[in-house]
Amino acid sequence: LRVVRNGIGIEQLFSVDISGLLGLWSLTVAQPASCDSRAMDIDTDDARLVLLVLSLVDRTLLLGWREPSGEQVDVAEVALSGWRLGEPTLAAGLASDRRHVVQATSSAIVLIDSVGWTVQAEWVPGEIGMSAISAVSVSGDQVAAAIDGRTIVYLEVRQGALACVGHRQLDNVVSCIDVHSWHGVAGPATHVAVGMWSVNDVCLLALPDLVTAAPALSLRMSQGLALPASAINLASTGQDSLPRSVLMCTLGNTPYLLAGLGDGRLHQFALSVDADGVSVREHKSIALGSGPLGLTPFVNHGSLNVFASSDHSAVLFADKHQTAH
């Protein structure tokens, strides 16, 4: 694991050997919070607390430090109450107030208050008669999850609680899910994007009712067609090309639906999003690696970029009304 800070250049803060790493999330908590450390003390002044949430095969590991911390970064393993550390984490993120943290595991979605690290709310699949969470996306106060493979649940953080707004069952098993907004921090997500295991599709479900937005589109559609898109076919070319990650984002001024496949290819769908729905303006596919491709949004100097991780990594950004990497 290498941790870097992006400023004038990319500065490596520290590195550590970790085996069995399944996923990681970086959270910068705005509120001052105390940490009980197993390895070393972490100051509890008003500097921002940075947490790395590491999902391992059988547990969750938290690493923390304070920002700004100068050139020396004192990283410690921390044991915080409220976190479900005895099982892997599927997703983690900050609520819009940057004080509350959402952690999702296969057994529960938990809302944690960073002041005191207490559990504020908890949602479990048993509330809708199901057993296990299989995929989750967290974006601010919005949470979308796949339950028992085929059921999509949409939750919102509301005044320190987790409200289940809606759920519906799909015909196919979900491989990946995303609830990021095309509006960034300017507004909430209006759709959930869902990738499917058994068919090479990404479908768009309108929020809050999770209704299918529109009919399916073929991958081989021509540029300039303005057809409504709810299920975007990624062509049936084998298990390796099934969608492993999906992301809704705006690069420059253009909304995109991005799908990362198991063979390292990236599908980019440039969209038009308005009151009449969603339409595809342009589609292209590029190879960024040869293994499963993950997609993570981040902000660099005020502009949204996307980190694409596979056996090779790349950064996607807007360049003269198109994407570059």
Range-by-range predicted roles:
Residues 1-325:
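Large eukaryotic, non-enzymatic subunits of multiprotein complexes that serve as scaffolds/tethers
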